[in-house]
């Protein structure tokens, strides 16, 4: 494995499974030490253990990304433990699907709080350190649903679409200090949820994807590595779509 992130420290939210876990492990294979953040200590520690098994340092933290005070305290602990942070991956996300007329305000708020407010809080918590060291990489995991919308997911689509505007605005604010800010928009990815999809539903979905396949969490991890590594040094304010050609 190439060591393009040798001795850098990456914070990954939503690291307990799926895309977050894949990013944590790929970054570790590329030489990074990883801070694994998720809602539960069990999930965070499990992935941190996998990172350590790859020969890298790892720290596990459990926090609600939408709780500003808790995140600020966690960020302080992370900086104290790790000494510095070079990369922030805002990946934490949830869904609370439902048609507009049936969606509760609580379900709307829960999704916006985690998917959008969480990225804002974490980015703000580490931006001072990035500005001080005059370097840093921030990568926000959005979704193609934020580009095209989806019936029954107006809350999720709104949160993911807003991440694009957030990414571009922060890229303009932090760019002069050597900090890049980009977004990745995954398409349909093989997850626990898609594993239980009915065959006929899966077949219909594949018709919309020119590559005729769902992506894997590792596909998103490779895109994140590209943006976080030396190859991404002159890229900022952009959204990289990784969806098998579904959105063109």
Predicted regions and their residues:
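Alpha-helical segment proximal to the catalytic Tyr-Lys
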Residues: 128, 172-176, 233
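Active-site helix of classical SDR
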Residues: 123, 159, 167
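Substrate-binding pocket helix/loop in short-chain dehydrogenase/reductase
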Residues: 99-100, 107-112, 205
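Residue(s) in the substrate-gating loop at a strand-loop-helix junction
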Residues: 143
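C-terminal substrate-recognition "lid" of short-chain dehydrogenase/reductases
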Residues: 120, 131, 135, 213-242, ...
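Conserved glycine-rich cofactor-binding loop
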Residues: 9, 16-18, 40
């Amino acid at each position: 494995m190439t060591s393009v992130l040798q001795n850098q420290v990456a914070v990954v939210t939503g690291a307990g499974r799926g895309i977050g876990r894949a990013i944590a492990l790929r970054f570790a294979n590329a030489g990074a030490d990883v801070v694994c953040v998720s809602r539960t200590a069990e999930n965070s520690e499990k992935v941190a253990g996998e990172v350590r098994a790859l020969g890298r340092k790892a720290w596990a933290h459990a926090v609600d990304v939408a709780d500003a005070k808790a995140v600020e305290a966690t960020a302080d602990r992370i900086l104290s433990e790790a000494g510095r942070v070079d990369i922030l991956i805002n990946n934490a996300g949830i869904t609370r699907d439902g048609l507009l007329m049936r969606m509760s305000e609580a379900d709307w708020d829960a999704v916006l709080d985690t998917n959008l407010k969480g990225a804002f809080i974490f980015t703000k918590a580490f931006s001072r350190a990035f500005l001080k060291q005059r370097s840093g990489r921030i990568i926000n995991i959005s979704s193609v649903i934020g580009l095209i919308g989806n019936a029954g997911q107006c809350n999720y689509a709104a949160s993911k679409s807003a991440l694009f505007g957030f990414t571009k605005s922060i890229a303009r604010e932090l760019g002069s200090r050597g900090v890049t800010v980009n977004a990745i928009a995954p398409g349909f990815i093989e997850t626990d949820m898609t594993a239980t999809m009915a065959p006929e539903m899966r077949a219909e979905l594949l018709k919309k994807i020119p590559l005729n396949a769902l992506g894997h969490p590792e596909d998103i991890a490779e895109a994140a590595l590209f943006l976080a590594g030396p190859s991404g040094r002159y890229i900022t304010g952009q959204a990289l779509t990784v969806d098998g050609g579904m959105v063109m």
